[in-house]
Amino acid sequence: MSNHFYIEHPSFTSDCSTLVIRSQRVPARAAPWDLYACDADGLNLRQLTDEDDANNFALAHEGSLAWYQRGTTLWSVDVGTGERREVCGGPPDVLPMGYWCGCASPDGKFYFGYGRRRSDDQGVVIRYRTDGTEAVVLAADPHLCHLHASPGGHGISFGGVNERGEGVQYGMNHDGTNLRVLPTATLSHFTWAGTTKRFVGAGMWERRVIHTIEEGQRDSSVVVEGSFFWHTGISWDAEWTVADTNWPNEGLMIVNIRARQYARLCLTDNTAGHPQWTHAHPAFSPDGRRAVYTSDRTGMCQVYVADVPEEFKAWVATPNPDAAPGGRLPEWRPE
């Protein structure tokens, strides 16, 4: 079973030359995950890790390092050379906690990972200095999930519950200060909007929209509507969104936020069921020229890359009288 990193995290190296994925050795709940890399065109596949306890992978925003936890110890691996290195031990009285991905600050100074507090088994956010000098607990929550570092350096976000037991998304600074509830309750599968302070996501339940919101706003701004958008990856300049769809599954949609128009890029043929590995979870390469997604179209989840032609993007970004209400364009026909 193989998949790329989630919509919130980079799966390509900063120079866009290399794709990094994770692969489970056998399809079993407790089976180990290994990290692999290949060229952006799918060639030169190589294995980067083979430890049974590796988890919570994160790719650096700049350079060629990937970070991961073994238990509560931080490790790094060079995507180019395969060199692995133990970086920093974990904080005391914290147990391991495995999740999909960790995350790294865009300047590369910090890695944020998961653990569980020994005293009450609550999930904790661990911040490691990547120079190996410190590992500290920043926050705790009984339902900790979805650690995500803002590509613009505006802090990190994570999922949890409030005092009433309701699911919420929190934000805080890299040092753990300014813990607050983010205004993302109406956004499904949200992410930071590139390097900006805004957030972008699909509509909740019956709302067939992609919309954005910023801290301090009461209401979100609808970008496009019409398809049942599901997960939204976004370009670092926050001009483009790539979204998968469901009910029905219409494939990947490319959205230009400025023009408020969208069109289908490709079909994904994933089953889009309850298991996470049946979801496409699309994301862009840093240059926006490729979209990476996961599909179980063969019966087992694998990673796919779709080129996003510049001509196609120019067409989507140009106001078009043929766009339907809500911004959907007809199928693209390259000349």
Regions found by a protein language model. Name each.
Residues 186-188, 223-233, 260-284, 320-328:
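Conserved blade-ending motifs and adjacent loop-strand segments that build the rim/top face
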Residues 19, 65-66, 110-111, 155-156, ...:
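Hydrophobic beta-strand positions that form the internal "hydrophobic ladder"
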Residues 4, 23-33, 70-75, 92-96, ...:
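A flexible loop/linker signature enriched in serine peptidases of the S9 family
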